[in-house]
Regions:
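Conserved catalytic core of the tyrosine transesterase superfamily
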Residues: 1-303
């Protein structure tokens, strides 16, 4: 019967891949969460998903806490398993979904780290461009800040997705949703510099693809590769923050008065609530400036 648990899990992962067109990275994550739960079921001698109930899930939740998992990690598991059981219910393989009775764990909302405009410009100017990889890093972070790109979108960007004349990118976002995003002349100049010189030099070792950003061997950068570059560059500038150019992009647009719906479209957010995180940041910034600059506020601080 154990094979039945695994087999149904495999069917679900195929459904995500071929019908929902989820990314490989997302499918691998779902696979890990489901396997972890199947291991728990095996320990409890459960051989049928229909035997999973609310009390059992409370026990599973306790086990997750005993493993010292963060609440965000626990919520990630619950979300994946809730979706899996919804699939089983839809396919009439189970009678109900007990995960609907389990609430997500409350977490303290942490606003994304960002840099003020002057800081962001300083960071970009601090990037060394003495060699091909430095030019690549400069072009990549300039573009990420210019267009608010995710790391995965940088990875998937290909030469024919870039219109240098119109300064427009065709971005292949989450859930296979495409969008067009503009970029400015400064980012274009660095992009041209990188594509015509640094990338050409790096691609001598590998000419079999059209991906824009490559490693020292000419192979396309991976998600981890882009994340490492961003982390290395930003931590060199400010080791106290986990900075992403995308967060500063959104914050700076909203601070300058951009319409939130437009920012939502540029970021490729499905839900407006996700974009609204950045309005909280701008409110904090406005309050900070107010407390510092308003004469009455200064009086109170001095007294």
């Amino acid at each position: 019967m154990k094979m039945n648990l695994d087999k149904l899990a495999g069917q679900y992962l195929e459904y995500l891949q071929y019908q929902r067109h989820y990314s490989i990275k997302t499918i691998e994550s779902y696979n890990r969460q489901i396997k972890h739960f199947i291991y728990f079921l095996n320990q409890e001698a459960i051989t049928d998903y229909n035997d999973v109930n609310y009390l059992m899930l409370r026990g599973y939740l306790t086990k997750l806490y005993e493993e010292n998992l963060a609440k965000t990690s626990i919520n990630h598991k619950l979300s994946a398993l809730r979706s899996f059981f919804n699939y089983l219910l839809k396919e009439e393989l189970i009678l109900d979904n007990p995960f609907l009775l389990i609430e997500s764990q409350k977490t303290a909302q942490r606003n994304p780290d960002f840099l003020f405009l002057e800081e962001m410009l300083d960071l970009l100017e601090s990037i060394e461009t003495k060699d091909d990889l430095g030019v690549r890093n400069k072009a990549m972070l300039e573009l990420m800040y210019a267009s608010g790109l995710r790391c995965s979108e940088v990875v998937n960007l290909q030469i024919f997705d870039i219109d240098l004349g119109q300064m427009i990118l065709l971005i292949h976002g989450k859930g296979n949703k495409d969008r067009y995003v503009p970029f400015h002349e400064y980012a274009r100049d660095w992009l041209i510099n990188y594509i015509e010189e640094a990338r050409t030099s790096l691609m001598i070792k590998n000419e079999g693809h059209n991906f824009v950003f490559v490693n020292k061997f000419g192979n396309p950068l991976t998600n981890r590769g882009v994340e490492d570059i961003v982390d290395r560059v930003t931590r060199h500038y400010d080791p106290t923050k986990k900075i992403h150019p995308r967060h500063s992009f959104a914050t700076h647009l909203l601070n300058a008065g951009a319409d939130i719906r437009t920012v939502q479209e540029l970021l490729g957010h499905e839900n407006l609530a996700t974009t609204q995180i950045y309005t909280h940041i701008t409110k904090d910034h406005l309050k900070e400036v107010y407390l510092y600059a308003h004469p009455r506020s200064r009086e109170n601080k001095e007294n």
